[in-house]
Amino acid sequence: MTKYFGTDGVRGIANKELSPEMAFRLGRTGGYVLTQHKEDASRRPLVLVARDTRISGQMLADALIAGLLSVGIEVLDLGVITTPAVAYLIKIQGADAGIQISASHNPVADNGIKFFGADGYKLSDDTEEEIEALLDAPEDKLPRPAAEGLGTVDDYPEGALKYTQFLEQTLADDLSGIHVCLDGANGATSGLVSRIFADLETDFDTMAISPDGLNINANVGSTHPQALSKFVVEKGADVGLAFDGDGDRCIAVDEQGNIVDGDKIMFILGSYMKSQGRLKQDTVVTTVMSNLGLYKALEANGMKSVQTAVGDRHVVEAMRKDGYNIGGEQSGHVILFDYHNTGDGMLTGIHLLNVMKKTGKKLSELAAPVQDYPQKLVNVKVADKENWQAYPEIQSAIDTVEKEMAGDGRVLVRPSGTEPLLRVMAEAKTEDLVSRYVDQIVDVVKQEMGSKED
């Protein structure tokens, strides 16, 4: 069976791999599968559809919606809105599913189609495979109703207001007295940030909130926070917040222009939650890519951590399974389960500002306990990435390095999820040490697996 779904929905270059024809088929198959499980059989199935600001978004949305309508599904078109807004509104509207058309932080030529179930969570592997089986079927045997059996579509701009009200209501007090610079990445947050931060009574300046269909994520946003860093210093602001194209990430900048990544944000929010007696099991959930500096800071401040595989989906799964209420990734996906079930950049941002206001501390002071260890990552081309652990010499090289580190560094070796690469990463006290450690392991990988560096 063809694997259409990646770690975050179906992605590709818009109008090529991700064509309008594919979007139509995803509407039919995905809509059909997701609405077969609805609890109330007496009403028509309802699906929410939204998109980010990419030029290809309208084309793919129209094709996707046509597919949904063709199997008798009612559609609420939310227009341009963030991914976490879709996840929230599914539950508020009592919808059977939600679909976001976005490639998140990727370049403008890319796009993606991301599905959420009736519970507002991303789909399980089993559900994705059910959709993939229908996509691969030699013949489309899904229903083709006529006349009154067809679905209808309604625009629903009110969704944005409901979502912004939800965000504002997660705070007990306003954020007056804070001067913040906001970078909308020319993406889905562009039309929302001014409303929210005005309602919360901040003093704010904005950049990258004028999308033209082509400038999403272009040298701005959470993957390029350097522009915001300069903007914060120019404006003399207390803090800057950079979002990504679909609004599920947030990277901050302190008053000196220093970047405060997802690791530091999780530490700041987790520490404050602990001080308020709200950090469940005194634990923060991270992925294996979080910096050793975060783990050292958590331990020094009486907190524990749980590590998952890379991807916010794995973080959410661990949080649901064991009852934790904060987790995330270095990239700025932060999940605050007390309020929402998915990463939400604006939710993260306003709660970071709330900690600044409640503690009276500057962001640089709040982030200071997390001292990043120098990190080096080398990708090595290999023929059989999944079986690297079968080579005892590689494991021996890792053991030797870890013994030298004596707890003051770490090694992570893992296969790439999409390419024939083995990723060798290490963190240590100094740049020289980390380079030596990585090179030691990479040399053995090349020797044992007959590979060459990409």
From Swiss-Prot:
Gene3D superfamilies, alphabetized: Alpha-D-Glucose-1,6-Bisphosphate, subunit A, domain 3, Alpha-D-phosphohexomutase, C-terminal domain
Enzyme class name: isomerase
Enzyme Commission code(s) on record: 5.4.2.10
InterPro entries assigned to the protein according to its UniProt record, in alphabetical order: A-D-PHexomutase_a/b/a-I, A-D-PHexomutase_a/b/a-I/II/III, A-D-PHexomutase_a/b/a-II, A-D-PHexomutase_a/b/a-III, A-D-PHexomutase_C, A-D-PHexomutase_C_sf, A-D-PHexomutase_CS, Alpha-D-phosphohexomutase_SF
GO MF term list: magnesium ion binding; phosphoglucosamine mutase activity; phosphomannomutase activity
Residues where Phosphoserine is found: 104
Modification(s) after translation: Activated by phosphorylation.
Active site positions, chain numbering: 104
Cofactor: record remark: Binds 1 Mg(2+) ion per subunit.
Catalytic reaction(s) noted: alpha-D-glucosamine 1-phosphate = D-glucosamine 6-phosphate
Cofactor: Mg(2+)
Residues noted as binding Mg(2+) in the record, renumbered to the chain: 104, 244, 246, 248
PROSITE patterns: PGM_PMM (PS00710)
Keywords: Isomerase, Magnesium, Metal-binding, Phosphoprotein
GO biological process per UniProt: carbohydrate metabolic process; peptidoglycan biosynthetic process; UDP-N-acetylglucosamine biosynthetic process
Superkingdom, natural source: Bacteria
Gene Ontology CC annotations of this record: cytosol
Family stated for the protein in its record: Belongs to the phosphohexose mutase family.
Biological role stated in the UniProt entry: Catalyzes the conversion of glucosamine-6-phosphate to glucosamine-1-phosphate.
Name of the protein this chain belongs to: Phosphoglucosamine mutase
UniProt source species: Lacticaseibacillus paracasei (strain ATCC 334 / BCRC 17002 / CCUG 31169 / CIP 107868 / KCTC 3260 / NRRL B-441) (Lactobacillus paracasei)
